């Protein structure tokens, strides 16, 4: 706001909310370059965090014996060796083909935002042609409710010809056993496809 714009109209705010992009109200005296620097730094940190988590999870799933590749990274994020974990495998099909590439990344981005805003103790990453979620210290009932809500959200973002397949592993105890939960969810998904 400033000498040319006295206030941001509700129609602008509604449009921005509908399209999922932010609207900032900034006093005229604040330099735009400083705001952009802060926003870019926050985005970069968020992307770096997502890459670290995805790498650590993929290492935990695929290279479980090489603990140095994932244990300390996940512990720094608050996921401890003695916690209980459940892996959820999400596959998106269009006709009979698994959705990949840009479309899968779009779905993961929307899902990650939804998780970040609504839940704690859930990690997400894309792997190959699927999305993987890791729930930490959720009871069976809590896990079921969360997965139902996540499934509903995924159905809302799915295109008309897309199907969402979700398989949930049994809960395992310990970060070093995460690969077992992953393998179980993977086998369940293979049976569904």
Residue ranges and their predicted role:
Residues 90-96, 134-138, 170:
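Short beta-strand-to-loop capping motifs
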Residues 96-100, 141-143, 175-177:
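A generic structural signal for short coil/turn motifs at secondary-structure boundaries
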Residues 106, 145, 177-183:
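Generic recognition of stable, solvent-exposed alpha-helical segments in well-folded globular domains
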Residues 80-98:
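Catalytic-site or vestigial catalytic-site microsegments of nucleotide-handling domains
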Residues 167-173, 180-193:
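Cyclic nucleotide signaling catalytic output domains
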């Amino acid at each position: 706001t400033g000498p040319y714009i006295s206030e941001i109209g509700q129609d602008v705010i509604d449009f921005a909310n509908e399209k999922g992009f932010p609207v900032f109200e900034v006093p005229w005296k604040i330099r735009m370059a400083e705001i952009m620097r802060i926003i870019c730094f926050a985005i970069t940190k968020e992307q770096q965090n997502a890459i670290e988590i995805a790498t650590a999870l993929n290492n935990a799933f695929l290279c479980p014996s090489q603990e140095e590749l994932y244990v300390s990274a996940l512990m720094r994020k608050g996921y401890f060796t003695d916690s209980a974990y459940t892996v959820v495998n999400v596959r998106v099909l269009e006709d009979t083909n698994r959705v990949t590439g840009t479309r899968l990344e779009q779905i993961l981005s929307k899902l990650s935002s939804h998780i970040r805003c609504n839940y704690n103790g859930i990690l997400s990453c894309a792997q190959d042609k699927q999305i993987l979620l890791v729930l930490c210290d959720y009871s069976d009932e809590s896990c079921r409710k969360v997965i139902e809500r996540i499934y509903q959200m995924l159905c809302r973002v799915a295109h008309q010809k897309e199907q969402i397949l979700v398989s949930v592993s049994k809960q395992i105890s310990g970060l070093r056993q995460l690969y077992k939960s992953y393998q179980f969810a993977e086998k369940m998904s293979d049976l569904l496809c």
